[in-house]
Design a protein with these regions (language model features):
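Short flanking/linker segments adjacent to small metal-binding domains or redox-active Cys/His motifs
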Residues: 206, 361-373
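FNR/FR-type flavoprotein reductase catalytic core
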Residues: 112-278, 282-287
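Ferredoxin-reductase
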Residues: 10-123, 140-141, 175-178, 188, ...
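Local cysteine-cluster metal-coordination motifs and their immediate loop/turn environment
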Residues: 153, 310, 314-339, 349-364
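C-terminal accessory/binding modules appended to enzymatic or scaffolding proteins
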Residues: 281-321
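Short, surface-exposed secondary-structure boundary micro-motifs
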Residues: 75-77, 129-130, 372
C-alpha cells in the first residue's frame, strides 16, 4: 500500500470509492460505541453485525489472547485503503466486546481518520485477532512497562492477569501529562479492586522529564525476576530495553511489541500460481496441524506457506504478511524451509523450530508444521 497521506475521507466519500477485491479471510465488524479516553485517544468498541444480509462470523474467528491486536482497513482516497494494527485493550476474560484504542498522531492518516470519523453503526473490515505479545501463563508475577498508547495491550494483559491469575502485577506508565493518561479511571478502579496485587507507577514528563534508562532501571529494579512486557514509542522502548540490560534481566523474560507500517495489502485476496512450478521439481506437500485438525495440502515451491493455507480456506493466523510482526509464526516439525524475510524471530526462536508462514518456501518434498504448540 502507498503510505503517502491523502486528504481525510468523509463518510459521504466512501460510496464513491471502487470496491477492492478482498480475501475470504477478511471479517466485517460494526462499531457499537466510541469512547473518548482523552482529547486525542478514542476506544472503538466492536460488535458482530447481525443483519439478515450480514455474513456469519464463527466465534472462533474472533477468539483472542491478552496482548493481541486487530488489523483495521481504513478508507483512503489516494490508495483505496490503508491497513493499520491496533492493540486490543479489552480482556477476553473480563470484557464481552473486542475493543481497540486509537491515539491521534500528527502525521498518522489512519489514526486521524478514525478519531474524526469513526462512529456507532459504522462497519469496518478487520483481520482476525493476531500477535505474539502474549503471556505464556497468567499466574506469573508481571512487570508491565508502557508509554502513551502503548498502554493498550498492557491493559489487556493487566486485566487478564488480575482476573484469571494469582500473581502480582506492576505497571510503570509514562505520559506527557496528567490529561494524556489513557485509562486513568480504569487503572484507578483496578487498583482499588486489587489493592494487594496491583501497583501502578505513573511517570509524567511535564513533572519528571523524559523517562531515561537510568530512571526506568531504578523503578524496575525490585521486579527483575518477572516476565516483562514493554509497549510504547520507540525511544521509550529503547530506554526500557537498556534499563533491563543494565539490571541483567534475561532476554527470554523480555517481550517487546513493535508495529511497522505495512507495504503490502493484507486484506487482498490471495492468488496462487500453480503453473509457476512446472519447470521445477513440482509442488511439495505440507502437513499442517491447526486448531486441533490436521490438513494435507499441495504446496507450490514458488508460493509462501501462509498464502497456500489462506487460498485453501484455512484460518491460519497472520497480520502483516511481510515478515515483520511474527503473528504467523508456526513450529516446524519435519522437513526444511527457507524464508525470504525474517525481521522478528531471534536465534533462540529458530532453534526451537519457529518459522514465519508468510515468508516460508519448501526446501524438501514434505514439510510438517503445527500451530497448536
Amino acid at each position: 500500500l502507498n503510505r503517502k497521506r491523502g486528504r481525510a475521507l468523509t463518510e459521504a466519500d466512501l460510496d464513491q470509492l471502487p470496491d477492492e477485491p478482498l480475501g475470504d479471510h477478511v471479517l466485517t465488524l460494526r462499531i457499537a460505541e466510541v469512547v473518548a479516553e482523552t482529547d486525542d485517544a478514542r476506544s472503538l468498541v466492536f460488535a458482530v453485525p447481525d443483519g439478515p444480509d450480514d455474513p456469519q462470523i464463527p466465534p472462533a474467528r474472533l477468539r483472542y489472547s491478552p496482548g493481541q491486536f486487530l488489523t483495521l482497513r481504513v478508507p483512503s482516497e489516494r490508495t483505496g485503503s490503508v491497513a493499520r494494527c491496533y492493540s486490543l485493550c479489552s480482556s477476553p476474560f473480563t470484557d464481552e466486546a473486542l475493543t481497540v484504542t486509537v491515539k491521534r498522531t500528527a502525521d498518522g492518516y489512519a489514526s486521524n481518520w478514525l478519531c474524526d470519523h469513526a462512529h456507532p453503526g459504522m462497519h469496518i473490515h478487520v483481520l482476525a485477532p493476531s500477535g505474539t505479545f502474549v503471556p505464556k501463563t497468567l499466574d506469573d508475577d508481571f512487570l508491565l512497562l508502557a508509554a502513551g498508547s502503548g498502554i493498550t495491550p498492557i491493559m489487556s494483559i493487566c486485566k487478564s492477569a488480575l482476573s484469571e491469575g494469582s500473581g502480582q502485577v506492576t505497571v510503570i506508565y509514562a505520559n506527557r501529562d496528567e490529561n494524556s493518561v489513557i485509562f486513568c479511571d480504569a487503572l484507578r478502579e483496578l487498583s482499588g479492586k486489587y489493592p494487594d496485587r496491583l501497583t501502578v507507577l505513573h511517570w509524567l514528563e511535564s513533572l519528571q522529564g523524559l523517562p531515561s534508562a537510568a530512571a526506568l532501571a531504578k523503578l524496575a529494579a525490585p521486579f527483575t525476576d518477572r516476565p516483562v512486557f514493554i509497549c510504547g514509542p520507540g525511544p521509550f522502548m529503547e530506554a526500557a530495553r537498556v534499563a533491563l540490560e543494565t539490571l541483567k534481566v534475561p532476554a527470554a523474560q523480555v517481550h517487546i511489541e513493535v508495529f511497522k507500517s505495512l507495504e503490502s495489502d493484507p486484506f487482498a485476496a490471495v492468488k496462487i500460481d500453480d503453473a509457476a512450478d512446472e519447470d521445477d521439481a513440482g509442488p511439495a506437500t505440507a502437513v499442517v496441524e491447526l486448531d486441533g485438525e490436521t490438513y494435507t495440502v499441495s504446496w507450490p515451491r514458488s508460493a509462501k506457506l501462509l498464502d497456500v493455507l489462506l487460498a485453501k480456506g484455512l484460518d491460519a493466523p497472520f497480520s502483516c504478511r511481510e515478515g515483520h510482526c511474527g503473528a504467523c509464526a508456526v513450529t516446524l516439525r519435519g522437513g526444511k524451509v527457507s524464508m525470504e524475510v525474517n525481521d522478528v524471530l531471534e536465534q533462540q526462536d529458530l532453534d526451537e523450530g519457529l518459522i514465519l508462514a508468510c515468508q516460508a518456501h519448501p526446501e524438501t518434498d514434505s514439510v510438517e508444521v503445527t500451530y497448536d504448540d
